[in-house]
């Protein structure tokens, strides 16, 4: 049916044709989403559908946070379309992960935030991780320690330092996200940081920092003078 097509638009304005001609960088978020969705719904062509979906979900960041089930609550989003969109968003999230053959160098809190921001800012639960570093501050690995509210009873020093010891690392960075988007440290965050810092001194593994990831924001406890 006609409402499912963009037949009234000149061919050079169609999202897919624009991608072929100018490249993906030239497309708006609405146009890229329209290519993924492929078809509109009754009364809306696919560009209008895409615009509405971005508006109702709060933009790309809001869209990325939704589960498949939550996506299907929006008009025009069936289970197949929701699953395809979620898979595309997940693929994009994974693509920002660094090439495992290239070890990033961490010289500042900004470096570690840049490394993990696009993945961790969208997580809907707290994930606590430990970054193991070489003597020249190359990332040797990032270990997942716990999922859920950060609590000193759940974060045992043994688990935090195990991978660092295995990798012969002499320094680590603590890392976790706040799903609320606000990276302000809680009293529990501070307690865990100090406890692990004390444990690191005993083991000879320095805790360089604890970086908390929010929604495109971060806080370094080192920069705050807490560590």
UniProtKB/Swiss-Prot annotation:
Keyword Metal-binding: yes
SUPFAM superfamilies: JAB1/MPN domain, RuvA domain 2-like
InterPro entries: MPN, RadC_JAB, RuvA_2-like, UPF0758, UPF0758_CS, UPF0758_N
UniProt xrefs under PROSITE patterns: MPN, UPF0758
One GO BP: proteolysis
Organism: Desulfitobacterium hafniense (strain Y51)
Keyword Zinc set for record: yes
PANTHER family reported in the protein's UniProt record: DNA REPAIR PROTEIN RADC (PTHR30471), UPF0758 PROTEIN YEES-RELATED (PTHR30471:SF3)
Entry protein name: UPF0758 protein DSY3180
